[in-house]
Amino acid sequence: MGEYTLRCAGCGNLLIGGAASCPLDGGLPRADYIERRFNPRKLPGIWSFIDWLPVDGWNRSTGASSVTYRSSGLAAELGLDSLYISFSGYWPERGALMRTCSFKELEAAPTMQMLRDRKAGETLVVASAGNTARAFAEVCSITDQPLILFVPVSSLDRIWTTVEPGRVLVVGVKGDYADAIKLADVLSSRSGFRAEGGARNIARRDGMGTVLLDHVRRFNSLPNHYFQAIGSGTGGIAVWEASMRIIEDGRFGERLPRLHLAQNTPCAPVYNMWHGMGSEESDFDAYGCPEGMHDDVLFNRNPPYAVPGGVRDAVISSGERIYGIDNSRAVSAQKLFEMSEGIDILPAASVAVAALVDAVESGFVENDDDILLNITGGGVKRLAEDHSRVKLKCDLTVGLRDSEDALSSIEEIFA
């Protein structure tokens, strides 16, 4: 089990009672694990990293991990000697067994386990534009954890499981992801309900951080560079935090991997803020965001950018950059990856591939650098060969203006 104290990622203040933010500077909470050495256990999936996960127990039926391998196909196309790919999805030939085909399973399993460890009997509440909802629906159905999903109506077709749905209620939101978050927050504030927590959820971040841990376990060192497509940027924060723990161990490298984070322009709040262009909601409304994006799961109006311990701190600390990738470059990158590596990927992951192509062409990486590319989702077509999918029905549809009666009805259902 991962024994830890909770501290502010900004000022280091000790946080009590599972606090979601620091009362001194509003910083993100961070787990300070008692175990300082990287010592993977002989347990399945991400549970092998249980010493650096904020859980007491583990569930054999959940916790599929990402798989890291050395690329030959894409590496040859880009002229790279040491390109490593972290694949989160379904690709059994590589040992990747995430049946919702997204790295969001890395968040769902430890979050569910942390909730069960508390034995509070609460119903989990999650807001999502698609991939997160799918992962939590799968994991909670397997473990019989009651779950309420708030999903934009436009994203409902992405919500499916490969198991019979459990105690999962799907609420279609007339609005975007930000509206789904607002409604989820209202319900989560009421007795008997527990918010998933977003970027402030240490189980979510440390679960995603296992992408970096798997690379270190397999290849015995930290990479020089790390590439990922981001929406909120929480995945980048997670890898930064995991890297600091590895460096403290002292056996696998002394320098942080340089974070190369990518967003899908023009709907790119983190990219805009990093480059000093602001992030006004009116700007995104003018572009029709998130409609028209190569993958709208990468759009988050309110990312944890400037908060202590957030995206800005992570990128400044690692000394690299944030990319803006338009649709045409993402489409080309997706074709390049699928052709060279032989597996289908989710559109969001292609934005990271495009950033890597950009970095190679611009000379930001050297041919012999160790590079870790996070393919955050893929294998949907491959999954169809082995498993059927069960589409979750929408139980009710609500908007911000007419939500109170609906939320009261939900309370009665889960009372």
UniProtKB/Swiss-Prot annotation:
User: Per UniProt, what is one Pfam family of this protein?
Assistant: PALP
> Pathway, according to UniProt?
Cofactor biosynthesis; coenzyme M biosynthesis
Enzyme Commission code(s) on record = 2.5.1.76
Annotated binding of pyridoxal 5'-phosphate, by residue: N131, T376
Which molecular function GO terms apply here? cysteate synthase activity; pyridoxal phosphate binding
Catalytic activity field: O-phospho-L-serine + sulfite + H(+) = L-cysteate + phosphate
Keyword annotations for this protein, in alphabetical order, are:
Coenzyme M biosynthesis, Pyridoxal phosphate, Transferase
BP terms from Gene Ontology = coenzyme M biosynthetic process
List of residues that carry N6-(pyridoxal phosphate)lysine = K104
Q: Which domain of life is it from?
A: Archaea
Recorded coiled-coil stretches: none
Per the entry, what this protein does is:
Specifically catalyzes the beta-elimination of phosphate from L-phosphoserine and the beta-addition of sulfite to the dehydroalanine intermediate to produce L-cysteate.
| Family to which the UniProt record says this protein belongs | Belongs to the threonine synthase family. Cysteate synthase subfamily.
Q: What is the annotated quaternary arrangement, including any partners?
A: Homotrimer.
Supply the name of the protein.
Answer: Cysteate synthase
- Give the originating organism: Methanothrix thermoacetophila (strain DSM 6194 / JCM 14653 / NBRC 101360 / PT) (Methanosaeta thermophila)
